[in-house]
Amino acid sequence: YHRSGKGVLVTTTTHMYVEADTDLSCDFFALRDKIIKDGYCMAGQKISEQSKPKMCGLPYDLLDRLIKDMPQALDYVIIEADGAKHHSLKYPAADEPVIYPLTTDVIIVLGTWEKGKLCKDVVFRYELMQNELGMAEDVVVDDSVIDMLRQVYVKKLRDSGFEGRISTYYR
């Protein structure tokens, strides 16, 4: 989006690793100025000082204010909502996905590069998936497993009251 001249803010609802040039100030004016100047800003709150620092998302009141006060400069807010801890696929926990209340569109990203491998080796929270769905130990990732995970996410989103658009990106 940024390459097409659109103003973009990127954050998370839970936590993620801090990328280079991420703004961790949680300062409205600093974030506003960066979006206006650069057309792009990744932002959050720092939560760890480890060798690879992590951040959590912007406070919702700050996110609300940025969206409300910057309609001329902020075209898209992209919020990572449910990471898979470096796995290609994930089975969501009971309280996931966590989405920002004013979300209009959700893109479910599903990794397809590990088809043919055992689910237990590539699905984050496989044990939960196995317990809830009664899957056998030797189930292999194929299109039906990937589609089942997509359906689980869609159901959880709809059950949570999300009425916006849901699309899927197969990576």
What are these regions (language model features)?
Residues V8-T12, M42-Q45, V77-A81, H87, ...:
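General beta-strand structural signal in soluble alpha/beta enzymes
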Residues A93-K115, R125-E132:
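Inter-motif core of Ras-like GTPase G domains
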Residues V140-G161:
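A short, acidic, amphipathic alpha-helical segment used as a generic capping/interface helix at domain edges
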Residues C26-I35, D121-V140:
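Acidic, Ser/Thr-rich peripheral helices and adjacent loops at domain boundaries
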Residues H2-P53:
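N-terminal phosphate/diphosphate-binding loop that engages ATP/GTP or pyrophosphate donors
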Residues S48-Y91:
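Phosphate-binding/switch loop-helix module in NTP-utilizing enzymes
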Residues T13, A81, G111-T112, E132-V139, ...:
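G-domain G4 guanine-recognition motif of GTPases
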